Amino acid sequence: MSFFHNVMNKLGRYRLIPDRTTGSDYMHRYYIFLKDRNWFPFNVTLHKIVRSDDPIMHDHPWGFMTIIIKGGYWEHTPCINPHTKEIVGENKVWRGPGSIIMRTSTEYHWLELDDNKPTTTLFFMGPQKRDWGFLLNNKWVHNETYLKNAKTN
């Protein structure tokens, strides 16, 4: 492990986030600013993403901005029919080093690593606005409901 990892781990500012359906490593999160931020409106973390998302759209509990530092990923976002507001496909855009991405808490996406190569990002999250979930058949499904069903299938 790196010196940075060891220091952050000793300070209690590191968290390994497992894939919520398989339990395998998904992301290494380092709390650069605050670990517990109930009283503060934003936070800054360093993410090392080591696994692609499952290929299903999800949103986040907060708006965010991320800057790709190393590596990159394909970001899949919904392609929406402007007349019916229904999702009719996906946009797939490469996000490489230097890319800056901003999203509200209600915007959907999923991330696909390129050849399973890790990606490092600086991640700025705003205040929590809502619970997060997944988009199934053009309907929002709470993350706990989706993940419970995903584990049993």
Protein language model annotation of sequence segments:
Residues M1-N43:
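A short, N-terminal "cap"/entry segment at the start of jelly-roll beta-barrel domains
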Residues G23, N38-F42, F64, H76, ...:
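Beta-sandwich/jelly-roll carbohydrate-recognition scaffolds of carbohydrate-active enzymes
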Residues V44-H60, S105:
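Conserved short histidine dyad/triad with adjacent acidic residue
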Residues R51-S52, Y73, E107-H109, G126-R130:
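Short, solvent-exposed loop/turn segments at secondary-structure junctions
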Residues M102, N116-G133:
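A short hydrophobic beta-strand segment most commonly corresponding to one strand
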Residues D131-N153:
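Active-site or metal-binding loop neighborhoods of secreted/extracellular toxin and effector enzymes
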